[in-house]
From Swiss-Prot:
Its cofactor is Mg(2+). Binds 1 Mg(2+) ion per subunit. May bind a second metal ion at a regulatory site, or after substrate binding. Residues 5-146 form the RNase H type-1 domain. It comes from Nitrosospira multiformis (strain ATCC 25196 / NCIMB 11849 / C 71). PANTHER family: RIBONUCLEASE H1. Endonuclease that specifically degrades the RNA of RNA-DNA hybrids. HAMAP family: RNase_H (MF_00042). CDD domains: RNase_HI_prokaryote_like. Its EC number is 3.1.26.4. It is found in: Cytoplasm. Mg(2+) 1 binds at residues 14, 52, 74. This is Ribonuclease H. One of its GO terms (biological process) is DNA replication, removal of RNA primer. Pfam families: RNase_H.
């Protein structure tokens, strides 16, 4: 029997990369019952897609119990990857249709495990279009870039 889910947690995630590959950052804004939590981090050498995935992973890891989640991302790579492509990748032992290894499979596997704990609605939003939650996540991702540039570990 599944545990009773808490009320809906709204999560907004974004990734940023200065060069691709290059220095990158991720950010996540979690909102629940009037509370907010901001998460961000960065890496010195990464890709935009890794940062988009890491934003989602770190946000879901921050949830302390099974939750109903509305997850907003401006990354079609993340949204389609988790909603459509992952099922075929798993059937093909983490290979694409043309038999090449799935890029970022380490993060996709981690995300796949995390999604099993929660009921998640995956929502795509257009980036840089004035959506408050997405704009805030973008600001956090850029803060992550700055921490990576300074060599400071983030939260």
């Amino acid at each position: 029997m599944k545990a009773k889910l808490a009320e809906v947690v709204e999560i907004f995630t974004d990734g940023a990369c200065k060069g691709n590959p290059g220095v990158g950052g991720w950010g996540a804004l979690l909102q629940y019952n009037g509370h907010r939590r901001e998460l961000f981090g960065g890496e010195k050498m990464t890709t935009n897609n890794r940062m988009e995935l890491l934003a989602v992973i770190r946000a879901l890891e921050a949830l302390t119990k099974p939750c109903e989640v509305r997850l907003h991302t401006d990354s079609l790579y993340v949204q389609k990857g988790i909603s459509e492509w992952i099922h075929a990748w798993k059937k093909r032992d983490w290979r694409t249709a043309d038999k090449k290894p799935v890029k970022n499979d380490d993060l996709w596997r981690e995300l796949d495990l995390l999604t099993q704990r929660h009921k998640i609605e995956w929502l795509w939003v257009r980036g840089h279009s004035g959506h408050d939650g997405n704009e805030y996540a973008d600001m956090l991702a850029n803060r992550g870039v700055q921490t990576a540039l300074r060599g400071v570990s983030a939260n």
